[in-house]
Design a protein with these regions (language model features):
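Non-catalytic substrate-recognition/targeting regions of SAM-dependent transferases
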Residues: 1-32
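Conserved beta-strand segments that form the floor/walls of ligand-binding pockets within enzyme
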Residues: 6, 22-26, 41, 82, ...
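Short loop segments at secondary-structure junctions
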Residues: 11, 191-192
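Generic structural signal for well-ordered alpha-helical scaffold segments
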Residues: 12, 43-47, 141
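Short, glycine- and charge-enriched coil/turn segments that flank and shape catalytic ligand pockets
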Residues: 12-22, 50-52, 113-118
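Conserved SAM/SAH cofactor-binding pocket of Class I
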Residues: 29, 33-111, 120
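S-adenosylmethionine
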Residues: 49, 83-191
Length: 192
């Protein structure tokens, strides 16, 4: 995935390059193994945007793969948020096995959330359906600091214009976009 990120099943043996950042994952029931185009594009964007010491929020965290990748890339702390209890359990378990339970928090719910202070995150990722992204655009932008990055994915190319309009109306600026098959991912910056 990307330049240095490698996602492997936790039970698999893997020998890679010294520069590889290996993320071992047992996906369980929750979505997010790194192989679906939307997850793959999110991971590529995370590799491009996460800097050492940043604070990361994953809305719709599923298996926790995006948080694990962000932490492996140097994020200081990651918060996962999901409406599905199975995803919360899976994400917590994967973060613990990956050795990141001390640097992560997983909460049930969506944004806005009492445990998610406005402007507290440098990078926010949301790999969720277009209609949900449109509804949450303002809350996602509120969660990120001024000049911070929001990565959206889970959007079919036919809905990309609607998602971009919602984020631009809420104060987001498109920084980059990519597409695999019919799926898109877009990186927005919160206007200063």
């Amino acid at each position: 995935v990307g330049t240095n990120l490698v996602i492997v099943p936790r039970s698999a043996e893997f020998t890679g390059r010294d520069s590889d950042i290996v993320v071992g994952l047992e996906p369980g029931l929750a979505f997010g193994t790194g192989h679906h185009p939307t997850t793959l594009m999110c991971l590529e964007e995370i590799e491009d945007t996460v800097k050492s010491g940043c604070r990361f929020l994953d809305v719709g965290c599923g298996s926790g793969v995006l948080s694990i990748a962000a932490l492996a890339l140097g994020a200081e702390h990651a918060v996962g948020l999901d409406i599905d209890n199975d995803a919360v359990v899976s994400s917590k378990a994967n973060l613990e096995v990956a050795g990141f339970s001390e640097r992560s928090t997983v909460l049930q719910g969506s944004v806005p959330h009492k445990g998610i202070p406005d402007g507290d995150f440098d990078v926010v990722a949301a790999n969720i359906a277009a209609n949900v992204l449109i509804k949450l655009a303002g809350a996602l932008l509120a969660a990120v600091s001024e000049g911070g990055v929001i990565i959206t994915s889970g959007v079919l190319d036919t809905r990309l214009g609607d998602v971009v309009s919602a984020f631009e109306s809420a104060g987001g600026v498109v920084q980059a976009s990519r597409q695999i098959e019919d799926w898109t991912a877009t990186r927005f910056v919160r206007a200063k």
